[in-house]
Every structure is written in structure tokens, then in C-alpha cells.
């Protein structure tokens, strides 16, 4: 079977086509979420991450390295305000990263760390019509100039408090929306209802991997 296309091939192709040409949605369940707060949060993250730190309301992609220079993590770092930062990374490497954070937090008294993986449940929307869908779910201006690529904001989407970032692993226009677990079903239902006439289609992990490969997006776990 490994030398032939799987039986899921045609279904995956339909999901990819929906995202590429119109609009798709997917649960974001494969990321670990970490929160750092405090007056020393920025300096701490600037020390353990190899990339540039983002400005307020922005996100950057940043590697995390071992002392030897080897890759220890590929993370998305978000700056909510001067003392609040989120890191999104691999759920597979979550415990390894937790140990790394704890090791470097020893003796640091101006940073508070919290694992937020169980507190954040996400849904991603992607495709040419994703901005139209988002505009129907929120009262805020989500035009390209007002909500730029790699912008992040606390807002209300579908009537529930949410953290929204303009970022997509599909390589298409897209957004990731994170809410507390008790609001995820509400968000799901709102996307289904509001996106009905847009013909929103749900897509899975195989479609996501196919699309990110076609756009040369790397993956590290």
C-alpha cells in the first residue's frame, strides 16, 4: 500500500481544492500553547529564542536552540502587550519544552510561566474567502490594512472572547482563532451557520500537510 495512493487520496484532494479555491476550516489541535507574563518576560524570551522578538500585537516565527546550536524547537511567539507573550509550538515536544523553560526559569523572579494547551482550543479558517467569513463573525475591521499578516489581537468572534492571529499553515490567506474550551462548540456552530452560503468545508491534517508542502512551508516536531 505504501507504493500506491491511499484510499483517502480523493477525499484529501477535495479538501485541498476547497481551501485553495474558496474556504476551509479545521480544528487546531496539534499545537502546544505557552504563556509568559511579567516585567521580565520579554528579556527572558529574547534570551532563549534565536529570532527577533515581535512588537506589540505581532507574531514572529523563531527557533529555540540548545547550547550546542542544535534545534530544540520551532515556535511562533506572539506579543500581546509589554508583559504578556504566547508561544505556540509542537504538542509532541511539549514536555521537552516545558523542562527547558523550567531549567532556564530557575532563579528568575520577574517571569510567570503557564502551560495554556488545555485552556486554548483553536479553529483555523483558510482560503480566499476566509476574510469574508471572519468579517461576518466580528465587528472589528479585518481588512488587509487593518489586520496585517502576522497581526494578533484579543477580540470577540462569533460572540465569544477569542485570540485571533492572521496566520495560516496552508500557505493561503487564513486566520487561527483560539478560545476557551467552553466556547469552542459555539464558535464551531457560528462558523457553520455564517459560512453556509460561502460553502465552507472542513479539512483535516492530511490536507493541511499537502498544502504546506506545496507552499514549501517547513515542519519540525
Where are the model-predicted features located?
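Glycine/proline-enriched, intrinsically flexible loops and inter-domain linkers
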Residues: 1-221
